[in-house]
């Protein structure tokens, strides 16, 4: 949620910054005029309440002196009905203001590239492992034997999309045998790395209430993409960001504890409503997938430094796995609803000859904290909103996909990245294994 006081005081600047985020100026004009009417209604109610108190005193005086109070009583009733009508108007305006404000995205940080879509994103850096060239150089033409990750998985008998579709529908799968073990190895490795970086590991609920979805900014705008629990105001989480960030909703955090860092593995559920026809095969776009999430609560002056270190935490996983990637800064038109600044980390998929998003790391500044009422006491002793950050560390299925493509061999086997071997009992290769 944006700061309404900032919007009132900086109309021209706020209009321009919202336009950078694809919001027409009329929306802000409407919001501010409703906000003005709401504040006027509040003032009128206060003035009428003062009037009512005066009349009440007159009635009491008249009763004490046994004089006629009928005029005063009539005036009191009139004032009372005016207050009632204004209270109803104020409540209605409150709802309208809140609803309009709830649909406005966060404002972008000053260094975010301005543009309507991903074409305006700016590459920050590219990373390739030194040993990578011995396997398969990124950006060179893919050799004929190179298969897509889903073909590798199906040939090895470790990914079963057919039975996933039979049991659950499109965009679901079974991990089988070494596939299940590889997925488990990947997320355990990720959690261990983040724990060493000072993140507290959590296991969260995977069903949350509507207030939690509102708090992180998924609701009301993205309700159509959520898996709802029928008959209840609850949702299966689209990311562990929701339960992790809402952990402190409505609380005041001790300043000396900041920054606070959480990490969690969770299944994530997404309808992918706008993705018809995109990535219909494989692990890239599923309705249910595992993801390791990172969340931070920081003081405002620390948050951009913490954004850089959180991005480095995501990159660390890919570097240790030996997977080539690049980092891009998202433009104002490509950023998520709650973000003030976002880096996407994209892993190289050699068969497709394309980078695919594997992590998105965002600073939401105080946008989520305002919705969730998460505060701390600043140095002046005043209550202030914390800044919240979130990032994937990483999407587990997409990491498995990148390993299968980047580490496959001409004979169809897949070399296990060195850092994962201890998690697989020392196994260094995935080979085709028969299963029923």
UniProtKB/Swiss-Prot annotation:
The UniProt gene name for this protein comes to serS
The record's catalysed reaction(s) read: tRNA(Ser) + L-serine + ATP = L-seryl-tRNA(Ser) + AMP + diphosphate + H(+); tRNA(Sec) + L-serine + ATP = L-seryl-tRNA(Sec) + AMP + diphosphate + H(+)
The Enzyme Commission number assigned here is: 6.1.1.11
Q: What is the lineage of its organism?
A: Bacteria, Bacillati, Bacillota, Bacilli, Lactobacillales
Positions annotated to bind ATP? 270-272, 357-360
User: What organism is this sequence from?
Assistant: Leuconostoc citreum (strain KM20)
- Is Ribosomal protein one of the keywords? no
UniProt function note:
Catalyzes the attachment of serine to tRNA(Ser). Is also able to aminoacylate tRNA(Sec) with serine, to form the misacylated tRNA L-seryl-tRNA(Sec), which will be further converted into selenocysteinyl-tRNA(Sec).
PANTHER family attached to this UniProt entry: SERINE--TRNA LIGASE, SERYL-TRNA SYNTHETASE
Which residues are listed for L-serine binding in this entry? 239-241, 293, 392
Q: What is known of its domains?
A: Consists of two distinct domains, a catalytic core and a N-terminal extension that is involved in tRNA binding.
Q: What is this protein called?
A: Serine--tRNA ligase
Q: How does it assemble?
A: Homodimer. The tRNA molecule binds across the dimer.
This protein's pathway reads: Aminoacyl-tRNA biosynthesis; selenocysteinyl-tRNA(Sec) biosynthesis; L-seryl-tRNA(Sec) from L-serine and tRNA(Sec): step 1/1
Task: Tell me which GO cellular component terms the UniProt record holds.
Answer: cytoplasm
The record's section on InterPro entries has: aa-tRNA-synt_IIb, aa-tRNA-synth_II, aa-tRNA-synth_II/BPL/LPL, Ser-tRNA-ligase_type_1, Ser-tRNA-synth_1_N, SerRS_1_N_sf, SerRS_core, tRNA-bd_arm
User: What does the UniProt entry say about where the protein is found?
Assistant: Cytoplasm
Main localization category: cytoplasm
Query: Which GO molecular function annotations are given, in alphabetical order?
Result: ATP binding; catalytic activity, acting on a protein; serine-tRNA ligase activity; transferase activity
List UniProt keywords, sorted A-Z: Aminoacyl-tRNA synthetase, ATP-binding, Cytoplasm, Ligase, Nucleotide-binding, Protein biosynthesis
């Amino acid at each position: 949620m944006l700061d309404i006081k900032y919007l009132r005081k900086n109309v021209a600047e706020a209009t321009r910054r919202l336009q950078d985020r694809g919001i027409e100026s009329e929306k802000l004009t409407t919001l501010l005029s409703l906000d003005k009417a709401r504040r006027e209604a509040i003032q009128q109610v206060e003035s009428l309440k003062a009037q009512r108190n005066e009349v009440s005193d007159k009635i009491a005086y008249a009763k004490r002196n046994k004089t006629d109070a009928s005029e005063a009583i009539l005036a009191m009733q009139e004032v009372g009905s005016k207050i009632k009508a204004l209270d109803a108007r104020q409540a209605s305006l409150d709802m309208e203001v809140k609803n309009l404000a709830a649909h406005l995205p966060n404002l972008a940080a000053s260094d975010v590239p301005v543009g309507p879509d991903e074409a305006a994103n700016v590459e920050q850096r590219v990373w390739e492992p030194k040993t990578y060239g011995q396997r398969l150089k990124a950006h060179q033409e893919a050799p004929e034997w190179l298969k897509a990750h889903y073909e590798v998985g199906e040939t090895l008998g470790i990914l079963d999309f057919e039975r996933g579709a039979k049991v659950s529908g499109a965009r679901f799968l079974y991990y089988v045998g070494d596939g299940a073990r590889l997925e488990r190895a990947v997320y355990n490795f990720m959690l261990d790395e983040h724990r060493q970086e000072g993140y507290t590991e959590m296991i969260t609920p995977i069903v949350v209430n509507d207030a939690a979805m509102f708090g992180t900014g998924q609701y009301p705008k993205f309700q159509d993409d959520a898996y709802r629990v029928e008959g209840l105001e609850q949702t299966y989480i689209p990311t562990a960001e929701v339960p992790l960030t809402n952990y402190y909703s409505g609380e005041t955090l001790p300043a000396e504890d900041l920054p606070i860092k959480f990490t969690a593995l969770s299944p994530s559920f997404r309808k992918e409503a706008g993705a018809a026809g995109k990535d219909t095969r494989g692990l890239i776009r599923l309705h249910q997938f595992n993801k390791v999430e990172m969340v931070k609560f920081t003081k405002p002056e620390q948050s951009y430094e913490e954004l850089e270190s959180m991005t480095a935490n995501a990159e660390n996983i890919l570097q240790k796995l030996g997977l080539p990637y690049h980092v891009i800064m998202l433009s104002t038109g490509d950023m998520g609803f709650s973000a003030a600044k976002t880096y996407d980390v994209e892993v190289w998929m050699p068969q497709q000859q394309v980078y695919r998003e594997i992590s998105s790391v965002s600073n939401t500044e105080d946008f989520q904290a305002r919705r969730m009422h998460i505060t701390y006491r600043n140095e002046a002793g005043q209550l202030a909103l914390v800044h919240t950050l979130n990032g994937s560390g990483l999407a587990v299925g997409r990491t498995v996909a990148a390993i299968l493509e980047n580490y496959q061999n001409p004979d169809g086997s897949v070399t296990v990245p060195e850092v994962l071997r201890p998690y697989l009992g020392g196994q260094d290769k995935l080979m085709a294994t028969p299963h029923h």
